[in-house]
Amino acid sequence: MQVTAPRTVLLLLSAALALTETWAGSHSMKYFYTAVSRPGRGEPRFISVGYVDDTQFVWFDSDAASPREEPRAPWIEQEGPEYWDRETQISKTNAQTYRESLRNLRGYYNQSEAGSHIIQRMYGCDMGPDGRLLRGYEQYAYDGKDYIALNEDLSSWTAADTAAQITQRKWEAARWAEQLRAYLEGTCVEWLRRYLENGKETLQRADPPKTHVTHHPISDHEATLRCWALGFYPAEITLTWQRDGEDQTQDTELVETRPAGDRTFQKWAAVVVPSGEEQRYTCHVQHEGLPKPLTLRWEPSSQSTIPIVGIVAGLAVLAVVVIGAVVAAVMCRRKSSGGKGGSYSQAASSDSAQGSDVSLTA
């Protein structure tokens, strides 16, 4: 896992519930946490971000003037004050837990107090069309490198080095994986279903991409063809170039999918082609919002104008989202208090979406 936080960038089953709905495709809920130490400049900064699919819905920053769990999507604002008080308290407690973990890991690696260090965690669940758990995950990084991760069996750990093995032994003694599994199979999926219902107009939509091909001469002999996909949701999309029907994957420059700033995404794929041979190249676009895949060619008589303003806005939002795409801590033990709204289960009403307790220190 790769990270950044403030200045560094992170590039890291409820069987008893009677199911009355199904969802198209799979959906996910993820939490991303980052803690960054800054010697001589106060306590470490702690940031947490929650996502349902590709939509950010909550945010917490310990550096805020009055740190609170904050809504980042209209549909989450309907949760009652008990929800926000509970989530705020969990995030504040986690901020302290991560400060302790930063001290512990600095000791494990025999590092001085002078440098800045980062802990990241990402956890969450993927849910299938039947509303049940597809997979759960929990991953940790330290200073941008893998540290420890929960295996796919949700009962064992993979430690990256001898320092991480110290954490592994602590967590095995505390039976931490069992608690995580209970959260991932139960509470996580229940809250995800609740959020998908409450935010179905936005979370379960499929906006097709607006597509075009642009032409950029490099020299008298070569030009770049760039295939654009703009304004689509969800983020999953496939762009491929072909020459006379043969894939040009190895010769394609493909950027990561980027947020556009309006709750949609953008992406492009480019190939360098010999001048005069542009019509031998086709761009192929596949997305959930399209009734069938698109095939595009460059049209010399109608050179497309690139919507620069939207792309620049998307890059600005990307900087914010990348800070938000930081990795996370799981809180798994259940406790009953709070939560309004939702009709799926008592657990979803009483337990925190993040889990109801703070995580163990590393």
UniProtKB/Swiss-Prot annotation:
GO terms for molecular function: peptide antigen binding; signaling receptor binding. It is a single-pass type I membrane protein. PROSITE patterns: IG_LIKE, IG_MHC. The keyword Signal applies. Residues 25-308 are extracellular. Residues 336-362 are annotated as: Disordered. This is Patr class I histocompatibility antigen, B-2 alpha chain. It comes from Pan troglodytes (Chimpanzee).
